[in-house]
From Swiss-Prot:
Matches recorded under NCBIfam families: chap_CCT_delta, thermosome_alpha, thermosome_beta
GO molecular-function term, one example from the UniProt record: ATP binding
Source organism of this protein record: Arabidopsis thaliana (Mouse-ear cress)
Subunit structure: Heterooligomeric complex of about 850 to 900 kDa that forms two stacked rings, 12 to 16 nm in diameter.
Lineage, highest ranks first: Eukaryota, Viridiplantae, Streptophyta, Embryophyta, Tracheophyta
Coiled-coil positions: none
Name of the protein this chain belongs to: T-complex protein 1 subunit delta
Gene field: CCT4
Amino acid sequence: MAAVAAPMASKPRGSKAESFVDNKRREDIRFANINSARAVSDAVRTSLGPKGMDKMISTANGEVIITNDGATILNKMEVLQPAAKMLVELSKSQDSAAGDGTTTVVVIAGALLKECQSLLTNGIHPTVISDSLHKACGKAIDILTAMAVPVELTDRDSLVKSASTSLNSKVVSQYSTLLAPLAVDAVLSVIDPEKPEIVDLRDIKIVKKLGGTVDDTHTVKGLVFDKKVSRAAGGPTRVENAKIAVIQFQISPPKTDIEQSIVVSDYTQMDRILKEERNYILGMIKKIKATGCNVLLIQKSILRDAVTDLSLHYLAKAKIMVIKDVERDEIEFVTKTLNCLPIANIEHFRAEKLGHADLVEEASLGDGKILKITGIKDMGRTTSVLVRGSNQLVLDEAERSLHDALCVVRCLVSKRFLIAGGGAPEIELSRQLGAWAKVLHGMEGYCVKSFAEALEVIPYTLAENAGLNPIAIVTELRNKHAQGEINAGINVRKGQITNILEENVVQPLLVSTSAITLATECVRMILKIDDIVTVR
């Protein structure tokens, strides 16, 4: 035993040669995270820009989606690696912050990670890289703000140009001349003059109806429901001078709160039960009719039918139009539009809680029907957009594209500055940051230079997706910007470099600043991860 213990004891306990941490494992995990995130970025890169490709997504339940919206593609993608999931969340963050630039933000993040990978390989510490990226990002925002052109809400043309730029990269780009002005008018109609910088897109309701083409899309000054009027008992389908109630209770016999059974011993008792039910329903309808109400919007009930056949019969006799199964999440929009209050109990049914409209009618549209409420008195600041499409795929993509256009206009309302598109701001950023990197000392300069080079991925990808020579295009862009042409960008339609502002290719400043800020934050977070711990 002593012979065995002797060599063990002779080993130094705190050998300087031994490493305290397993650096190899940390590097492997960091590079695995970077490679996974870059794979996600490469998957959506081909869909960037007006000439970008579309993706066909087939879901597990057999649904097929055709889109080139970055947020939609990534949202439907099954990503398992945790770092790659961060890029999916990054796209969602950009979607909620700006509504557009969801592909751009992921592509920039992928390019930054590629540059960081080479910096790490050269032995630069992740913390140094992270701090330098933060500094470069701040400088980039300052440069973009200096390049921006102020815009006023009265300048409708600038708003339309910006919305058109967003729509030009979509599947429905040929309809941008229709959808862009429609998006601008919809947003401007819901702006509160007292708080002009706040736009709530929940005040704009998009209703999809299959049939026709996207050309038939239009705004409705009032309310539109993709529902039919209940006509089981021959009730009215058109009401003028409507007094509308939005109710959240059922017009049906009451039920007990506890589980119990009632034993009926003879037919007279049965007859009495039916008579009581009839009297109860008649009493409710008399109260409703007494207020002058002639249109009922009934909230959908998950427990039972919101309205029974007997109730429909009596409502039809009272000449009251019934629209049932209104979704719970629509109630707030409906009451705001009609300038009325939702009624939760028959005892609270009052005339002052009703909304007033000139006309409520059921209209035929294609092979289906919709309900329109127009001429609303004291209408709230809301608007409805009726989107049409020849098939479900086009209809869904038209809705997504219109949502992006609405978000772009919202961005301009909240931060009223425009910048050029077509890769012009990214090349200008790359040039100015590259010059700034030369005056920085130490490793910071290398990191900022890498940040500047990463931004060139946007013009490079735009040119590549348009079938142009990306190296020649980016080189020519650099020369133009070096000569002071800060608005020189890629005109993918002409296949050459032009003054992109003159071509009306513009985007909100908020979209670009948000993309660069969020991409930088995400990359810094990925760089700081040196281990993945799985827990049960």
